[in-house]
């Protein structure tokens, strides 16, 4: 896999870290602006870059936390076209949560099961119990709190 040159990688990383700090402060709009600025620096085709995976994950996670589940679904779905995204438990968790909140329960169950299989019940520990309870209604052996 090709790698970004060091200077570009550092610029992207700095913008991403700035976005992360804004998320910590609850400034989701500001964070999204930083993440998209970083994403715009990726050379085309952007889907070739591992940095694109974590940037799209950050965007989708931020969408989820701000309650913009449609954008979260769309951005996390797009993230699946980037390196090492399919099978990433966190990406599947957030995509499943967005699908759940949008009422797309079959898709939610599929994504949440992928998250559970890849990350185990520990992945759900800091999440609202409703997601694991829901998954327990769709699959045997899922222990909900």
Predicted regions and their residues:
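TPR/TPR-like (Sel1-like) alpha-helical repeat modules
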Residues: 39, 100-123
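Flexible helix-coil transition and linker loops at the boundaries of alpha-helical arrays
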Residues: 2-5, 42-49, 80-85, 122
């Amino acid at each position: 896999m090709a790698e970004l040159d060091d200077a570009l990688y550092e610029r992207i990383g700095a913008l991403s870290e700035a976005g992360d700090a804004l998320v910590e402060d609850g400034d989701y709009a500001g964070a999204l602006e930083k993440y998209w600025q970083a994403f715009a620096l990726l050379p085309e085709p952007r889907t070739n870059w591992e940095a694109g995976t974590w940037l799209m994950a950050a965007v989708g996670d931020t969408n989820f936390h701000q309650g913009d589940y449609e954008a979260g679904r769309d951005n996390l779905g797009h993230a699946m076209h980037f390196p090492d995204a399919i099978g990433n438990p966190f990406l599947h968790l957030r995509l499943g949560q967005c699908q759940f909140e949008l009422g797309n329960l079959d898709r939610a169950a599929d994504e949440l099961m992928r998250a559970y299989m890849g990350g185990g019940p520990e992945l759900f520990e800091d999440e609202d119990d409703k997601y694991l309870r829901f998954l327990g209604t769709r699959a045997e052996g899922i222990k909900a709190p």
